[in-house]
Amino acid sequence: MANHRTHETVDSVEALSKAFADVREAQKEFASFTQEQVDKIFLAAASAADKLRIPLAKFAVEETGMGVVEDKVIKNHYAAEYIYNAYKNTKTCGIIEEDSAFGIKKVAEPIGVVAAVIPTTNPTSTAIFKCLLALKTRNGIIISPHPRAKKCTIAAAEAVLKAAVEAGAPEGIISWIDVPSLELTNMVMKESDIILATGGPGMVKAAYSSGKPAIGVGAGNTPAIIDESADILLAVNSIIHSKTFDNGMICASEQSVIVLDKVYDAVKTEFEARGCYFLNEEELEKVRKTIIINGALNAKIVGQKAHTIAKLSGVEVPENAKILIGEVESVDLSEEFAHEKLSPVLAMYKASDFNEALDKADRLIADGGFGHTSSVYLNAITEKEKINVFAERMKTCRILVNTPSSHGGIGDLYNFKLAPSLTLGCGSWGGNSVSENVGVKHLLNIKTVAERRENMLWFRAPQKVYIKKGCLPVALDELKTVMNKKKVFIVTDNFLYSNGYTKPITDKLDEMGISYTAFWDVEPDPTLASAKAGAALMQSFKPDCIIALGGGSAMDAAKIMWVLYEHPEADFMDMAMRFIDIRKRIYTFPKMGEKAYFIAIPTSAGTGSEVTPFAVITDEKTGVKYPLADYELLPNMAIIDADYHMSAPKGLTAASGIDAVTHAVEAYAAMLATDYTDSLALGALKVIFEYLPRAYENGQTDVEAREKMANAATMAGMAFANAFLGVCHSMAHKLGAFHHLPHGVANALLINEVIRFNSSETPVKMGTFSQYDHPHTLARYAEIADHLGLGGTTNEEKTENLIKAIDELKEKVGIKKTIKDYGIDESDFLARLDEMVEQAFDDQCTGANPRYPLMSEIKQMYLNAYYGTNERV
């Protein structure tokens, strides 16, 4: 505990410097207090202030000559009781929030020393309020009182300090300027760590110009609209209650009332019946000259009774007159009644309709109360739309409905979710940094401790996957027996359609009495135009089931048709938007399956599209290939029937088989790989290396090889559907699009370059994903080699053996060694290389690669693959 100190008079720069040093010393100790210690001090300080609410109120009125003692008692009581109640259980010390599952911890720290500028209008209640906030947050505070209210402000601060110290707070945790001056106020703002400024626009501007963080409020010019639907008794008496409270010195109090024409007379009658005085033309002019002098508020009227202000104006009104009301028309600043008046003086306007009332209120706020408070009285049940319009139009941070604004604005009196406060933020409209009622959170620095956590991963596949040679009829039975489907739309290519591949499907549909039609105009690289044409036929036929039959092209085209059929409003470019995390993407894919069930039947063993959420489509206008990805594109059912694979030609067998190899290798190396995808990838590779050469050589005579390859391709598809692919596919997509190579061939020409690239233990940049904590792809490739029994003692040797094994497999199935070998003209390749590189870099697959590629690195890999060189990347 710090040594006992008595407050030394602060009346000079030197004395203030000493006070700052003392408060900082005390705050340094206070910063180590526990929540229990702080809460004990907070309670004691609030209790002491509450007990002195009457003496402090009397002192304030006596010293300032403004306001009403009884109302200041309420303000003092409110500042102590409501602030204590609001924050008594709020954590402000140490760990205030913790979520161990997500690894997030929030730690509250004090800011330091608060400079508190106190207004003359609320000199004791604001001092209590700010001192309590500082104590609850373990901050020190130095108060700069208004010269006109310094004694009562200091008395309030002293009372809080005494109680706090007796409860265990460090001596000197609260201090003040005894002889306030502009010089000392500026100094206290510049030397503090944060400023709580409550006062006029000049003081608030000075706070924001001090170079220190400031929370300041400005002038209010609250308009209150009384709609024709309003409860007039409620509206008028609420406004009187608010406007007369402490003689109108709450900055949120009504300055103008705007009444709709239909109820204007009734409102005026009620005001008069309740003791308000309406000024005639002559009296109005006299009061105008009194309330505003040379464009500024006359300080002599602030917080005075209506009778006193009338007397200053040379107007006789009853001594018990509650409010002086001036019926005026102009909302321009040239109209004195349009200004903030901080006294029981009110402007009253007539509006022909609600829109005109909004216009008037809008102008009054713009000229003098941006950001502060606005008020409306209406039937909140039947006129909700008017509330919405009012809230939309008013540039104020507190929009009060059927509420006296003085009491309503400060919070917790007429709405119990609006935080209690005596410093009301006005947001950027009012030149403030805060747009809400100021509370303890604004005097805290919150540290966020974020522990590393790994992403939630999943494994997703079609609802049903039928496997086994000859399983097609059994699988299709469900369309009738389980789903009761009526109309099927078949998507395939011209070759498959012309050669009878759709006949087993249509025969089964005929047997079940299900009508169907087919679209067979799918190209090898399906275009958006083709997909749109198919979707147009779908819209006409209105199927409840879609069957995609073919290789990746047919299934990809069918997926796009499915989207365009179910959601014709969907924008293709939005669907093609890249994402880092599929669950956080900007574009949300529309919900699929509401019109049609989707079945995929592959006729080649390679793409895996039957079990993936991906589709590749080409924009025929630009030639750009777009890989789309979303789990809404995942087929509902996949039918892996080797009967459809038996007669695949050698070229297709080779290209699709090596495509499946790249799927499995990239899925195993991917940053998002899991135990589930690893098992599928390794299993697929084992099968492919054994059975692809047999399927290639023996064709339809080797049933076992064909069926094994069908299953392996689907397993690899499931692996990359969840682990995603990498830069090999990014590059292959663009190589195929630019130079019209089959997709599987493009992958085959690039995969070994990518393995070498990814296996670097010192990459220029590694991929970004929480699970991927260090470059370990070399070891992953070595694991593949081990699984395939390729030999080698080091990871480097094993990886080289994997590359050799892939080269040997490619040679066995007739894949050429280089891009150049496929007749791609060198000058054309080089001329388009930079564009191809940039598009490959921007491909959706790039982000999942374990080594994040630079464009120069992608370029070198393309060059190596073209020339068959081995230039290090």
Ranges and model annotations:
Residues 5, 31, 315-455:
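Conserved C-terminal structural/oligomerization subdomain of aldehyde/semialdehyde dehydrogenase
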Residues 265, 273, 611-723:
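Carboxylate- and glycine-rich phosphate/diphosphate-binding segment that chelates Mg2+/Mn2+
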Residues 738-741, 745-828, 871:
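Gly/Pro-rich interdomain helix-loop hinge
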Residues 156, 529-643:
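Glycine/threonine-rich beta-strand-loop-alpha-helix active-site module
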Residues 27, 137-152, 213-227, 243-281, ...:
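Short loop-to-beta-strand entry elements in the cores of soluble alpha/beta enzymes
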Residues 3, 10-12, 128, 204-332, ...:
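ALDH superfamily catalytic-core signature
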Residues 95-234:
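Rossmann-like NAD(P) dinucleotide-binding subdomain of oxidoreductase/dehydrogenase enzymes
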Residues 2-105, 133, 273:
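N-terminal Rossmann-like NAD(P)+-binding subdomain of aldehyde/semialdehyde dehydrogenases
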